[in-house]
């Protein structure tokens, strides 16, 4: 069976039998049509317990890539935190108790929705409650979502938070869209807006809920809400404690850096804060206390390949680069021996419906170069289905799928020419459901299954009831390497 192998992850493309508002079905996709006819294929589960999330919870890129790269189901922080709240372990957390004892005033910051991708509203409320019951003066700083949930669902979430704060006697201090607070592409002007707001230097309003409704009236949805503060809020003090409740790291790193790093030079800051506590490890360089430490994941796909002395290439554009490196490698940043990483810059546009092809063709070129060079294993992510799906623009999402289809055709052709095996799958769905029955835009991920195609010597059928955690062993089987005991079985 021994062959070199390409693993292609088509982010945000799932299987939805309903063809209405389904960008995948609506797209012209000759490469996919050929794959369905000629290559063994099946469906994989990418949500709920199949990827270590609560039942019914949609999958996401972080979880999906961890599952694919580690070859096992890792119970995600979302599940771990839920359990810690249920059994009262969270309030006993040593790092939390230290912060509450040290700081009279405490600020809770995070994405407030039930999307479950970066955070959960229930975690936010649990933290407010713990801090308030401890006797601290507590300030809530809500980041509005509109991306992992409906674009105007914020009104209900923020109403819920406002009432919760009032009943608890805590301050509802600021509101800011994730476009500003959770940038991850070093667009520091956006993060600065959030920073200024936390310091009490933003536009002041008497009622945050009314401001949100006014934003909707001006066609500004949750993701893009401009930073605003309650008129009674006076800003953070340097001695205050700050707790970040997002459990996913990639979109909180920049804000933490702005608030805490002494080396930050991107813009002038009035204050730097030392008493920070994050829900999970956002970046090892921060040296900050955390509530939930990383679980150690050993014998990942990338590690096994590296230890065997084989070469590997990991490539994607900026938006998904962390997923094929850090997350795919089990939450480890460091480069492995014989591992090459190629980062293709994402286009500098406000939202990707402006350029649905994104940088797919450049990413495709990097893969073909890797095949021609003879890399033993290549993993690539095409971001289009997900990133354009998040915009809610149906026509742009169709173009996104068509761009991916073109790239698949080229890579498959190149793989066959050089006798490479290939596996094509997705980490989760998105663009296959762009509107609901009422015509509301759907910008979030789905819970639908995803396609998997396997072209390799001796493979004619894929087993039933498989998931993303069965892919790593499949790659090792193709490469003729021993499958570690920590991994789930192969797809074939």
Curated annotation (Swiss-Prot):
Pfam families: iPGM_N (PF06415), Metalloenzyme (PF01676)
UniProt: Mn(2+) 1 binding residues: 386, 390, 445
Keywords: Glycolysis, Isomerase, Manganese, Metal-binding
One GO BP annotation of this record: glycolytic process
Pathway: Carbohydrate degradation; glycolysis; pyruvate from D-glyceraldehyde 3-phosphate: step 3/5
Domain of life where this protein originates: Bacteria
Cross-referenced Gene3D superfamilies: Alkaline Phosphatase, subunit A (3.40.720.10), BPG-independent phosphoglycerate mutase, domain B (3.40.1450.10)
Binding residues annotated for Mn(2+) 2, in chain numbering: 11, 61, 427-428
First and last residue of the signal peptide: none
This protein's GO CC annotations: cytosol
Keyword Metal-binding part of the UniProt annotation: yes
UniProt EC number: 5.4.2.12
UniProt cofactor note: Binds 2 manganese ions per subunit.
Keyword Manganese: yes
First-tier enzyme category under EC: isomerase
Enzymatic reactions: (2R)-2-phosphoglycerate = (2R)-3-phosphoglycerate
GO molecular function annotations of the record: manganese ion binding; phosphoglycerate mutase activity
Active site: 61
SUPFAM superfamilies documented for this protein: 2,3-Bisphosphoglycerate-independent phosphoglycerate mutase, substrate-binding domain, Alkaline phosphatase-like
Subunit structure as annotated in this protein's UniProt entry: Monomer.
Record's function text: Catalyzes the interconversion of 2-phosphoglycerate and 3-phosphoglycerate.
Entry similarity comment: Belongs to the BPG-independent phosphoglycerate mutase family.
NCBIfam families: pgm_bpd_ind
Protein name according to UniProt: 2,3-bisphosphoglycerate-independent phosphoglycerate mutase
Organism (species): Campylobacter jejuni subsp. jejuni serotype O:23/36 (strain 81-176)
């Amino acid at each position: 069976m021994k062959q070199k192998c390409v693993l292609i992850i088509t982010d945000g493309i799932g299987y939805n039998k309903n063809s209405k508002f389904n960008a995948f079905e609506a797209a012209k996709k000759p490469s996919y049509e050929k794959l369905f006819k000629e290559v063994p294929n099946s469906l994989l589960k990418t949500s709920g317990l199949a990827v270590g999330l609560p039942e019914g919870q949609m999958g996401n890129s972080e979880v999906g890539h961890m599952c694919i790269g580690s070859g096992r189901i890792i119970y995600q922080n979302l599940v771990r935190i839920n359990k810690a709240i249920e059994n009262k372990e969270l309030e006993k957390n040593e790092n939390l108790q230290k912060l509450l004892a040290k700081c009279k005033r405490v600020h809770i910051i995070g994405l407030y929705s039930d999307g479950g991708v970066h955070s959960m509203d229930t975690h936010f409320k649990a933290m407010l409650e713990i801090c308030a019951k401890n006797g601290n003066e507590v300030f809530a700083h809500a980041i509005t979502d509109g991306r992992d949930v409906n674009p105007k669902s914020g009104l209900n979430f923020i109403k819920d938070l406002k009432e919760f704060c009032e009943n608890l006697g805590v301050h509802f201090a600021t509101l800011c869209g994730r476009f500003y607070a959770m940038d991850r592409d070093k667009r520091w002007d956006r993060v600065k807006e959030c920073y200024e707001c936390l310091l009490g230097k933003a536009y002041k309003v008497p009622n945050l809920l009314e401001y949100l409704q006014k934003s909707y009236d001006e066609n500004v949805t949750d993701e893009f809400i401009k930073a605003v503060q309650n008129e009674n809020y006076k800003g953070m003090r340097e001695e205050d404690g700050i707790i970040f409740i997002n459990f996913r790291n990639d979109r909180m790193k920049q804000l933490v850096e702005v608030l805490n790093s002494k080396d930050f030079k991107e813009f002038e800051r009035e204050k730097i804060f030392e008493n920070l506590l994050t829900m999970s490890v956002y970046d090892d360089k921060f040296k900050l206390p955390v509530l939930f430490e990383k679980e150690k994941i050993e014998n990942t796909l990338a590690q096994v390949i590296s230890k065997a002395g084989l070469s590997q290439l990991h490539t994607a554009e900026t938006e998904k680069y962390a997923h094929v490196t850090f997350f795919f490698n089990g939450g480890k940043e460091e480069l492995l021996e014989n591992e090459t990483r190629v980062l293709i810059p994402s286009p500098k546009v406000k939202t990707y419906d402006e350029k649905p092809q994104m940088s797919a063709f450049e990413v495709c070129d990097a893969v073909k170069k890797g095949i021609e060079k003879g890399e033993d294993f290549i993993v690539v992510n095409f971001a289009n289905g997900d990133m354009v799906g998040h915009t809610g623009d149906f026509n742009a999402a169709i173009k996104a799928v068509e761009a991916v289809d073109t790239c698949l055709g080229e890579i498959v052709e190149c793989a066959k020419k050089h006798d490479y095996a290939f596996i094509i799958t997705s980490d989760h769905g998105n663009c296959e459901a762009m509107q609901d029955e009422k015509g509301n835009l759907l910008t979030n991920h789905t819970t639908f299954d995803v396609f998997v195609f396997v072209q390799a010597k001796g493979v004619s059928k894929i087993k039933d009831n498989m998931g993303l955690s069965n892919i790593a062993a499949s790659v090792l089987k193709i490469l003729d390497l021993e499958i570690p005991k920590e991994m789930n079985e192969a797809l074939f």
